[in-house]
Amino acid sequence: MAKKDGAIEVEGRVVEPLPNAMFRIELENGHKVLAHISGKMRQHYIRILPEDRVVVELSPYDLSRGRIVYRYK
């Protein structure tokens, strides 16, 4: 996982899939965010299903949106 400078990585659980490869993620602390799949995950056809545990990268500027960078097996 290539970490961007200033990005915040948190673990969460996929609550529901949304159109256009977006997902509603519930973080460990209870907050819900909107996240899309990172380019490398999309490139390698990694499937994200409801109830999957994932790592989400959040921008410090907008903590309500993020990018899924890893799916736990």
Swiss-Prot record:
Looking at the UniProt record for this protein, which Gene Ontology cellular component terms does it annotate, in alphabetical order? cytosol; peptidoglycan-based cell wall; plasma membrane
Main subcellular location of this protein, as a coarse class: cytoplasm
Recorded hits in CDD domains, A to Z, give: S1_IF1
Question: Is-annotated flag, keyword Cytoplasm?
Answer: yes
User: Would you indicate the residue range of the signal peptide?
Assistant: none
Pfam families in alphabetical order: eIF-1a
Q: Name one GO molecular function term.
A: translation initiation factor activity
In which compartments does the protein localize?
Answer: Cytoplasm
| Domain S1-like: start-end pairs | 1-73
PROSITE patterns according to UniProt: S1_IF1_TYPE
Keyword list (alphabetical) reads: Cytoplasm, Initiation factor, Protein biosynthesis, RNA-binding, rRNA-binding
Q: What does the function comment of this entry state?
A: One of the essential components for the initiation of protein synthesis. Stabilizes the binding of IF-2 and IF-3 on the 30S subunit to which N-formylmethionyl-tRNA(fMet) subsequently binds. Helps modulate mRNA selection, yielding the 30S pre-initiation complex (PIC). Upon addition of the 50S ribosomal subunit IF-1, IF-2 and IF-3 are released leaving the mature 70S translation initiation complex.
Similarity annotation = Belongs to the IF-1 family.
What do we know about how this protein assembles, alone or with others?
Component of the 30S ribosomal translation pre-initiation complex which assembles on the 30S ribosome in the order IF-2 and IF-3, IF-1 and N-formylmethionyl-tRNA(fMet); mRNA recruitment can occur at any time during PIC assembly.
> What is the name attached to this protein's record?
Translation initiation factor IF-1
From which organism does this entry originate? Answer: Mycobacterium tuberculosis (strain ATCC 25618 / H37Rv)
